[in-house]
Amino acid sequence: MALLQIAEPGQSAAPHEHKLAIGIDLGTTNSLVATVQSGEARTLTDDLGEAMLPSVVRYQAGGITVGSEAVKSATQDPVNTLISVKRFLGKTQAEIEQSYGQLPYQFCQHDGALAIETAAGKISPVKASSHILAALKARAEQSFGNQEILGAVITVPAYFDDAQRQSTKDAAELAGINVLRLLNEPTAAAVAYGLDSGQEGIIAVYDLGGGTFDISILRLHQGVFEVLATGGDSSLGGDDFDSLIVDYLKQQTGVTTLSPAVLRLFINKAKACKEALSQYSTVNVGLEFDDEKHMVEVTREKLDELAIPLVKKTLRSCRRAVKDAGIENEEVLQVIMVGGSTRMPLVRSQVSEFFNKEALTSIDPDRVVALGAALQADVLIGNKPDSDMLLLDVLPLSLGLETMGGLVEKIIPRNTTIPVARAQEFTTFKDGQTAMSLHVLQGERELVDDCRSLAKFSLKGIPPMTAGAAHIRVTFKVDADGLLSVSAMEKSTGVQADIQVKPSFGLSDDQVSNMLKESMSNAKGDMQARMLKEQQVEALRVIEALEASLASDSGLLDEAQLAYLRAEIAELVKVRENAQQPNEIKTAIEKMDNASSDFAARRMDASIKKVLTGQSVDNI
C-alpha cells in the first residue's frame, strides 16, 4: 500500500504532484527505461531518439562507455567490451563455460565472486549491470530536467533464481536506484496488455529475449493478474540462435578456431543476418578477416532448419505450463509475444500453430516489458490506488524441510502465489535435545535424497526437555521478488535462528521439467517409501523410549520379564532394519506395545506411589 505524506497547507508546494517512478527492462541484448505520464506509459529515448540501449559496456583505463558507442568497439576490443552480462548474473565460471562455450573474456575471481579481467580492472557481472542501470537512470533524469527518481520496478526473467534476483538488486543499489520491486518479465507484459487493451481471461505470455526464455499462463480478471503456471529456461535466447548461425558461418568458411576479435565479428554478422531474415528470404553475409574475404549465403529456410530444435524446446515448456495451469490450449484467449527474438517468422508460426491462434503483437515486443514495469512502478509509488492492480506470481517448485528419517515435509507447495508466508510447528526427537538442524529443500519428491538442497542452518539454545515437549515454530517467507527466508523459533524461550536462501546454482527449464516428471512417475513408489520411513522412525522412537525406561526402572521386573522385553526389542530392531512393507513394522510395533504394557503399568503405579508417599488425604 502506498503511504501518503500529510502536511499543513503551505508546507507542500505541490501536494498532488506526480511522483516520478520508472520501469526498467534490464535485457540481455538491449535495455529500456519507461515511465507513465498523463496515464500513458511510454519509453524514454536518448538524444538520437533511440529507446533501446544496447546492454554493452566497454572498459578502458580512462573510462567506461555504455550502449551504442560500446557496441562499435566490440569487434576491435572484444576482451574489454562486455556483452550479454545478464547471462552471467548469479552463475559460476564452470556454469558459464558449460552453457555458452567459447567466449572472448578472461574470467577470474574477485572478492570471492566471478569477475572479468578488463583494462579497468576486475569487473563483476553485477558491476557491469549497474553501469547499464546507471545509464538508464541518467536518461530518465535528463528527460525530466533532473527531477528526482523516487523508485524503479526492474524486470527479471521468471526463472531467475534467488542468486540472480539478488544480483539484480545489488546492481541497482550500486547504480543508486531504489528498487520498488523486481517484476517477472512475462507478468510485466501482461500488465501492459491488461491495462492498455482491457483484456480478461487466460493469456499465454511467450517471452523469447536475447538470453532467456519464459512462458507464463496468466488469468486476467478485473485488474487482477494471477500467474497460473510458469516455465522457461534462463539459458536459452536469441544469443543461442546467433551461435547456430556462427557455427554455420564457420562451417561454410572452413574456419575452426577464431580469435576473440574474429569471434566478435562472426557474432555481430550472425545477429544482423538473423534480424534481416525476419524480413527477407535470403541474406548474403560478408566476412573479412585474416586478409581473406568470404561471402556466405544464408536463406530463411536454412535458418529455420538450424533453429527448429530450439523453438521446439520452447514449445515443450509451453506444453508443460499449460498442463500445470490445469487448462487446455483452447482456453487460451490471447498469446502475447515478448522479446526481439519473437520477430523470427519461424517462432511466430510455431507458437501460433501450438496455441491454434494468431499471436498478439499490437505492442512492440521489445518495449512491452518496460511499459508494463512503468505502469507497475506508477502504482507502487502512489500515483494510483494500489487496488487498481494486483500481481500474483507463483512458485515453480515446492519448498520444504527435512524431518526424521530423511523425509521431506512440504511447507509451501508448488504453484502457490507469492508473496506468501507459511508456518509449521516441529518438535525434538530425543530427550534433552538442545539443538536442531534445519535443512531447507526444493522439489516434489517425498525423500530428501530426491530433492534439491537449498540451505542448512541450526537452532541452538533449546531448553533440555523430554522428547516431543519442545515447540519449534518454523516460518517460510517468500517475498514478491521470489527470495526465500526461513526462520525457526523455540516458543518457550523465544530463541531464534534464520537464514535467507541465495542458492548459487540456478535451475534450467529442463531440470524443473525432469523434477516434475520424476515426481509423477515415482509418485506411488515415493509414497510407499515415505510410509516405510515413517514406520521406521516410529519404531526407533518406541525402541529408544523403552530402552530409556528399562535403564531407569528395570528393578520393577524380574530377570525373566526383563529378558523377555529385551528379546522383543531385539525383534523390533530386526524387523525395522529388514522390513520391506510399512505394515510389517506397524505390526511389530503393536506387538511391542502389548509386550510392554504390563511394564508401563508398573512404572505408572510406581510413579503414583512415589508422589503419594508421605502425603495425607487432605493434601491430596
UniProtKB/Swiss-Prot annotation:
Q: What is this protein called?
A: Chaperone protein HscA homolog
Keyword Metal-binding in annotation: no
Q: Which PROSITE patterns match?
A: HSP70_1 (PS00297), HSP70_2 (PS00329), HSP70_3 (PS01036)
Q: Name one GO biological process term.
A: iron-sulfur cluster assembly
The record's comment on protein family reads: Belongs to the heat shock protein 70 family.
Q: What are the GO MF terms of this UniProt record?
A: ATP binding; ATP hydrolysis activity; ATP-dependent protein folding chaperone; unfolded protein binding
Function according to Swiss-Prot or TrEMBL: Chaperone involved in the maturation of iron-sulfur cluster-containing proteins. Has a low intrinsic ATPase activity which is markedly stimulated by HscB.
**InterPro entries hit by this protein:** ATPase_NBD, Heat_shock_70_CS, HSP70_C_sf, HSP70_peptide-bd_sf, Hsp_70_fam, ISC_FeS_clus_asmbl_HscA
Matches recorded under Pfam families: HSP70
